[in-house]
Amino acid sequence: MIDALRLMAWLSPTYPVGAFAYSHGLEWAVECGDVRDAATLADWLSDVLERGAGRNDMILCACAHRAVAARDDADLVAINDLALALAPSRELHLETSQQGRSFLDATLQAWPCPALAEVAARLEGRLAYPIAVGAAAGAHGVAREATVAAYGLAFVQNLVSAALRVAPVGQSAGTAVLASLTPRVAALAETLHAADRDALGSATLRLDLGSFRHETQYSRIFRS
């Protein structure tokens, strides 16, 4: 029970990581017309979750958890470097690195433990968000599959929240989209919690290009 509550707290909208400031390119997708209602939002989120950063982040989270559990500092540093390198644009790099550092700092202060202190000492500088979450969960002994599932659901929730602010999608429709994607998150977590870095890969080229376009978008409220 305590592990589930810990994950809920760490990945809640109130956790001080600044998730509200990022849309992962969704703001540009709305601007260019790719996302214009609940149906197109669901399609866009499904692609990101199953073929883009959602899937990759869940794998990276699992890898970080595994490295901490094995006390493999070199692998932990290497997987963080890889996670940062996979960010396709400056804004998406900022999105993951700012949230990652904020998450680890907040968790180390509020939920300190010797293993997490060791992790923090190894991961100085830029830190990818899924690495921070996986490493913290591994340090606290939280189950890997539950961690990956919770991370994946929070990823989708944050983007649905962003959509409510920039897309013609109401709260009821947004909640329905989230509900429709929850079984996919669970299915992915069941598989990806055991995956390694060889399973990484994405096919969301339009989103990646959109994240570049967002840097010069005329009117915007998000940092990505």
From Swiss-Prot:
Gene3D superfamilies noted in UniProt: Urease accessory protein UreF
GO cellular component terms, A-Z: cytoplasm
Pfam family, one: UreF
Domain of life of the organism encoding this protein: Bacteria
Localisation: Cytoplasm
Subunit comment: UreD, UreF and UreG form a complex that acts as a GTP-hydrolysis-dependent molecular chaperone, activating the urease apoprotein by helping to assemble the nickel containing metallocenter of UreC. The UreE protein probably delivers the nickel.
Entry similarity comment: Belongs to the UreF family.
Name assigned to this protein: Urease accessory protein UreF
Organism in which the protein naturally occurs: Methylorubrum populi (strain ATCC BAA-705 / NCIMB 13946 / BJ001) (Methylobacterium populi)
Lineage: Bacteria, Pseudomonadati, Pseudomonadota, Alphaproteobacteria, Hyphomicrobiales
